[in-house]
Amino acid sequence: MDFYYSPRGSGCRTVIMVAKALGVKLNMKLLNTLEKDQLKPEFVKLNPQHTIPTLVDNGFSIWESRAIAVYLVEKYGKDDTLFPKDPKKQALVNQRLYFDMGTLYDSFAKYYYPLFHTGKPGSDEDFKKIESSFEYLNIFLEGQNYVAGDHLTVADIAILSTVSTFEIFDFDLNKYPNVARWYANAKKVTPGWEENWKGAVELKGVFDARQAAAKQ
């Protein structure tokens, strides 16, 4: 099972943690997106959108990290713990996954990605969207140890990757006590946390280098 990735990518780190939780071995194929490896014809043939992460399992190619995570659990999970089969429980996990993609991570991208290109962050309005995203997450976690039920699911793992990316960029999680409590626990119970954090540190290093270069 070939896994095309960059350790810096939040989505890539999500899949790595899910695979570790399942005990699934990935054949890691590093792509250097800064060198445009993702645009090479052999990769575009696998994924016309030329995005990472991309998984190729016995000739079946799938991309988008949350889709990959669910696929791995559905195919290789010994049970449905990480992605419940019960329709209501599954719907809640899916809602949190979509929240991560469309709200939480989106707010990160809009505020912090400009640092990579211009050396300056997004607008004050963009930062307010981050704050509102965390306010929502804080509400979701009221009285809860996990984001979608009473145990670890793929939703926790995806959101853990995103929240750790915010932390490495010095976003203050302590303003959101439920999130901070959840995060402290999630780091302890999620397989592959150390690898996730290492990738987040690497991502911050790339941004810092670009920001310094932009100031020269």
From Swiss-Prot:
Q: Can you give the residue ranges of the GST N-terminal domain? A: 1-80
Q: Which GO terms describe its molecular function?
A: glutathione transferase activity
Indicate what this protein is called per its UniProt record: Glutathione S-transferase D5
Top-level taxon in the UniProt lineage:
Eukaryota
Tell me its EC number(s), please. 2.5.1.18
What family does this chain come from, according to its entry? Belongs to the GST superfamily. Delta family.
Biological process per Gene Ontology, one example term = response to toxic substance
Record keywords, A-Z = Detoxification, Transferase
Listed under subunit, the entry gives:
Homodimer.
> Which SUPFAM superfamilies does the entry mention?
GST C-terminal domain-like, Thioredoxin-like
Q: Which residues form the GST C-terminal domain?
A: 86-207
